[in-house]
């Protein structure tokens, strides 16, 4: 038997079938570094329009988790796609470096008695070490960026820039000092930002407490009675017994109805709607003897249960009837609403009782409970209330309660003197910060759209921003306060610039070691130098100032306003939030045009990632076993707007999808053997109809992909590329052209036409996958024929694709119809193979019984219809002539019949043809193959 293998154009490529990503990706990273890829991108982008994605800084502590990887990969995919779209899209990664978590780590390692200077020194060293570790992990993901010059909030220039940003906000009239209840952590010894608060379940003691009336006559009058027949008391309900020693008022709703209830030995004031539930809870019988409105009770005095002082009734709209008694006890030092109400009634700061010290222990001077930790004092307080006859009921409940995000310990509201940025304070000029911010939200694009309402609600309802902290490792608030008036120095903004200049040279240490006289001269004795530091959310929230127009100026056409901020959905109350406030305070607009939020990673059952559940997926493990491109493909394949599921099984599915895409790319490369684009490419008008359709289909898909990349719909990009590879290419086009590729002359028009199409498809595909499969795209790029630059990323979307003319006879709709027919034929061939009626498809002969219109369409392919259907013979017959055993199909007006060919099999092309052996010199092959070997070669027109 003659071996005709040498006469075939068999596929051949050095592009490996096995990706070996864990080993290959580090080599590609080294190559990117050696050619200075990021620098070259900046060089070619000089004259392009700029797209600025500003990096939300991760905290410089610990190794990265899968959520970090997701975030960085999303950013990289956007910037790569923008680069391919013709933008200059730089990426300056950043780190958040100050704050309690790092200070806490240092204290745990070295102890709490280091001294402030040593603490700052060790914190800076620790953050530097952590950044280096995280940086290498981010680079391993294939993220291109300015890794040699990232921004760090602890860089001297950034620290100075933050002080300058604060000066701008001071200049705008937004900053003030005030006594207000703030989130307070005893372990931190400091106020916390809203974004540093987590909610966890906590067990608490609830108590119903009676406050005896002090003004009997006024209470009787309020209820329309001549006098009170018995002792009377008003009843409150609270989940914080420890606040009772600080009670200073009682709040009722002005519009609620309140009842005077006779319970035998005394009269109780309760909200009418709560009487039945309260009496049941107290196990008392009683009857309502009178009712009145809350407003009638205003300013009536009651007595504190165990201290010799009065608690007046104040009106408050925040009182609710969902639980309790309808009366709220007010400790203004430990509740925001309480504080606001008491201040509205004229209570001055000096009158506010605040017996809880910064460590959570009552001041020694507090009668009965001095020196006790507040949560441990609950039992003592309950006992005291019982002793004086004021305790009506107590029980333990489990409820959601605020905790410190770092220590996981319960927080309290605690009134302290702090620095605030006022939401409703009248600024030097223009609207209040709240009004500015709400307007800015309306001018911002949100992806997904629901983020707008969420951020709007948060801004509309948030309190003033407490920006001061009582810690060492933070950017200082460089204020001088007049010892007598408590006012800021009149040259505060000017002095802040002097401090900023020193900090730019020496870091924040410059402020802490500075003597006031250095700046104030003879005035120094009149002023206190403030030791507070700034909230870390102010650090990151002002990066638009100290990075985008400071350490890393972007030179955007419209100023230092980023096109995009992209972070997890928790940043609506974090970085998005703080950046919005500072941007509006300084520039009267948001520092971003668009906000994109992604959800959190969960396992495939929807559970949060937790070491205790053993469902944590570490990025390093994925890199070491599957490769970063598999992780990137997983990110791209998932709708990030909600929770994002990840597990070994899900990643395995991503790996399968990757293999299908890689195999398609390998097939394309292997069939471009011997193809030189400079000499072998055919103009569109010389290509076969099917090849022109394939290029046209590629062009249409490229337009869809560009649109989806532009809208950050990566899951659509992934799906469309995957389907194109598997269905339109693998399931249709590539299958059909194999015969032509392998059997026609190496330099024939039939083969060069297909190779031209494959080349165009390859040039497009390598760019399509580049934002997602960053490593594989550059690997593929090196194997493509023709001269090319060093990386696919140094190019834009492929422009060599041509569109089918509108009047082209075998146009888009035509090939859609042919595909449907091919699907129907394949389905029947599978049935026949399963029944062992035929072996391979090329053993089959198919007859298509079609209605006249379909017959006319299929007849346009002439004798090339068999190549499209990949059968040895394909015949057309009228639909009416279909025999009883013809199979109906899903294609209207089409039945078909498949039989095994009776003709011999060609040893070269494997088609079963009646002319096999007709040529005595080649007794084992068909006439077509003889012509392709030694004759003029077959001529194809369509497929």
UniProtKB/Swiss-Prot annotation:
Catalytic activity: tRNA(Ile) + L-isoleucine + ATP = L-isoleucyl-tRNA(Ile) + AMP + diphosphate
Any single Gene Ontology cellular-component annotation: cytosol
Root EC class: ligase
One record GO biological process: isoleucyl-tRNA aminoacylation
Chain positions of motif 'HIGH' region: 58-68
Disulfide bonds: none
Cofactor binding note: Binds 1 zinc ion per subunit.
Compartment list: Cytoplasm
Residues that, per the record, bind L-isoleucyl-5'-AMP: 567
Alphabetic keyword roster: Aminoacyl-tRNA synthetase, ATP-binding, Cytoplasm, Ligase, Metal-binding, Nucleotide-binding, Protein biosynthesis, Zinc
Enzyme Commission identifier(s): 6.1.1.5
'KMSKS' region (motif): residue ranges: 608-612
Domain of life: Bacteria
Pfam families: Anticodon_1, tRNA-synt_1, zf-FPG_IleRS
Isomerase as UniProt keyword: no
PROSITE patterns, per database record: AA_TRNA_LIGASE_I
Binding, Zn(2+): 906, 909, 926, 929
Keyword Protein biosynthesis in annotation: yes
SUPFAM superfamilies, per the entry: Anticodon-binding domain of a subclass of class I aminoacyl-tRNA synthetases (SSF47323), Nucleotidylyl transferase (SSF52374), ValRS/IleRS/LeuRS editing domain (SSF50677)
Domain remark from Swiss-Prot or TrEMBL: IleRS has two distinct active sites: one for aminoacylation and one for editing. The misactivated valine is translocated from the active site to the editing site, which sterically excludes the correctly activated isoleucine. The single editing site contains two valyl binding pockets, one specific for each substrate (Val-AMP or Val-tRNA(Ile)).
Biological role stated in the UniProt entry: Catalyzes the attachment of isoleucine to tRNA(Ile). As IleRS can inadvertently accommodate and process structurally similar amino acids such as valine, to avoid such errors it has two additional distinct tRNA(Ile)-dependent editing activities. One activity is designated as 'pretransfer' editing and involves the hydrolysis of activated Val-AMP. The other activity is designated 'posttransfer' editing and involves deacylation of mischarged Val-tRNA(Ile).
Record note on quaternary structure: Monomer.
Protein name in UniProt: Isoleucine--tRNA ligase
Top-level taxonomy: Bacteria, Pseudomonadati, Pseudomonadota, Gammaproteobacteria, Pseudomonadales
């Amino acid at each position: 038997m003659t071996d005709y293998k040498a006469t075939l154009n068999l596929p051949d490529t050095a592009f490996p079938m096995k990706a070996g990503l864990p080993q290959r990706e580090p080599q590609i990273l080294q190559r990117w570094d050696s050619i200075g890829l990021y620098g070259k991108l900046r060089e070619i982008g000089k004259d392009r329009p700029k797209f600025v994605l500003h990096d939300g800084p991760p905290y410089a502590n610990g190794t990265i988790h899968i959520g970090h990887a997701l975030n960085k990969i999303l950013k990289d995919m956007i910037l790569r796609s923008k680069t391919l779209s013709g933008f200059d899209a730089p990426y300056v990664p950043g780190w958040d470096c100050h704050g309690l978590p790092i200070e806490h780590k240092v204290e745990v390692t070295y102890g709490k008695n280091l001294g402030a200077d040593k603490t700052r020194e060790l914190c800076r060293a620790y953050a530097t070490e952590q950044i280096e570790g995280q940086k290498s992990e981010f680079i391993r993901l294939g993220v291109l960026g300015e890794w040699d010059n990232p921004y760090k909030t602890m860089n001297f220039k950034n620290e100075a820039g933050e002080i300058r940003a604060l000066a701008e906000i001071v200049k705008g009239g937004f900053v003030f000092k005030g006594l207000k209840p703030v989130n307070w952590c005893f372990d931190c010894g400091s106020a916390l930002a809203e974004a540093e608060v987590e909610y966890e379940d906590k067990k608490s003691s609830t108590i119903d407490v009676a406050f005896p009336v002090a003004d009997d006559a006024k209470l009787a009058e309020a209820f329309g009675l001549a006098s009170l027949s018995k002792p009377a008391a008003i009843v409150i309900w609270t989940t914080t017994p420890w606040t009772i020693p600080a009670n200073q008022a009682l709040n009722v709703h002005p519009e609620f109805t309140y009842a005077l209830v006779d319970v035998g030995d005394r009269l109780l004031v309760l909200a009418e709607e709560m009487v039945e539930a309260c009496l049941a809870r107290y196990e008392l019988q009683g009857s309502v003897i009178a009712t009145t409105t809350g407003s009638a009770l205003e300013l009536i005095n009651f007595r504190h249960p165990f201290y010799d002082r009065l608690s007046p009734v104040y009106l408050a709209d925040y009182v609710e009837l969902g639980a309790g008694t309808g009366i709220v006890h007010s400790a203004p030092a430990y509740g925001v609403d309480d504080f606001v109400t008491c201040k509205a009634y004229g209570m001055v700061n000096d009158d506010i009782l605040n017996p809880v010290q910064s460590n959570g222990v009552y001041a020694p001077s507090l009668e009965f409970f001095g020196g006790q930790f507040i949560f441990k004092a609950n039992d003592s307080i309950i006992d005291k209330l019982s002793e004086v006859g004021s305790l009506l009921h107590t029980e333990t409940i489990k409820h959601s309660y605020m905790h410190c995000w770092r220590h996981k310990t319960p927080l309290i509201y605690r009134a302290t003197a702090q620095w605030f940025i006022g939401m409703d304070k009248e600024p030097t000029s223009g609207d209040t910060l709240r009004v500015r911010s709400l307007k800015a939200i309306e001018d911002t694009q949100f992806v997904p759209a629901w983020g707008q309402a969420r951020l709007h609600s948060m801004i509309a309802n948030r309190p003033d921003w407490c920006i001061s902290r009582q810690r060492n490792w933070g950017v200082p608030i460089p204020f001088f306060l007049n010892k007598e008036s408590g006012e800021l120095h009149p040259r505060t903004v000017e002095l802040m610039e002097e401090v900023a200049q020193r900090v730019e040279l020496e870091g924040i240490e410059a402020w802490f070691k500075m003597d006031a006289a250095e700046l104030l001269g003879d005035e120094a004795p009149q002023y206190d130098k403030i030791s507070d530091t700034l909230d870390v959310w102010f650090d990151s929230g002002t990066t638009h100032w100290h990075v985008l127009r400071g350490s890393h100026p972007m030179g955007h056409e419209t100023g230092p306003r980023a096109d995009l901020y992209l972070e997890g959905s928790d940043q609506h109350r974090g970085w998005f939030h703080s950046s919005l406030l500072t941007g509006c305070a300084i520039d009267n607009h948001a520092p971003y045009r668009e906000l994109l939020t992604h959800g959190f990673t969960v396992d495939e059952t929807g559970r949060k990632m937790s070491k205790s559940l053993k469902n944590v997926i570490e990025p390093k493990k994925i890199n070491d076993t599957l490769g970063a491109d598999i992780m990137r493909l997983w990110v791209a394949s998932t709708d990030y707007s909600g929770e994002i599921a990840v597990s070994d099984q899900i990643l395995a599915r991503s790996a399968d999808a990757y293999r299908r895409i890689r195999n398609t790319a390998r097939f394309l490369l292997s069939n471009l053997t011997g193809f030189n684009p400079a000499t072998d490419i055919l103009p569109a008008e010389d290509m076969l109809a099917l090849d022109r359709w394939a290029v046209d289909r590629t062009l249409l898909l490229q337009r869809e992909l560009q649109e989806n990349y532009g809208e950050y719909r990566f899951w659509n990009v992934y799906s469309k590329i995957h389907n194109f590879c598997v269905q339109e290419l693998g399931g249709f086009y590539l299958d059909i052209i194999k015969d032509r590729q392998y059997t026609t002359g190496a330099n024939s028009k039939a083969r060069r036409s297909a190779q031209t199409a494959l080349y165009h498809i390859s040039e497009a595909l390598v760019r399509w996958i580049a934002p997602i499969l960053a490593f594989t795209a550059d690997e593929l790029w090196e194997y493509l024929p023709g001269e090319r630059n060093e990386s696919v990323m140094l190019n834009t979307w492929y422009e060599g694709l041509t569109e089918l003319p509108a009047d082209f006879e075998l146009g888009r709709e035509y090939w859609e119809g042919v595909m449907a027919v091919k699907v129907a034929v394949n389905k029947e061939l599978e049935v026949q193979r399963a029944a062992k009626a035929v072996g391979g498809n090329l053993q089959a002969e198919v007859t298509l019984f079609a209605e006249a219109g379909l017959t006319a369409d299929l007849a346009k392919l002439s004798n090339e219809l068999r190549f499209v259907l990949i059968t040895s013979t394909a015949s057309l017959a009228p639909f009416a002539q279909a025999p009883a055993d013809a199979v109906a199909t899903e294609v209207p007006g089409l039945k078909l019949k498949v039989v095994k060919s009776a003709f011999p099999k060609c040893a070269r092309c494997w088609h079963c043809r009646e002319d096999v052996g007709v040529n005595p010199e080649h007794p084992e092959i068909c006439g077509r193959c003889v012509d392709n070997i030694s004759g003029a070669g077959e001529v194809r027109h369509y497929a």
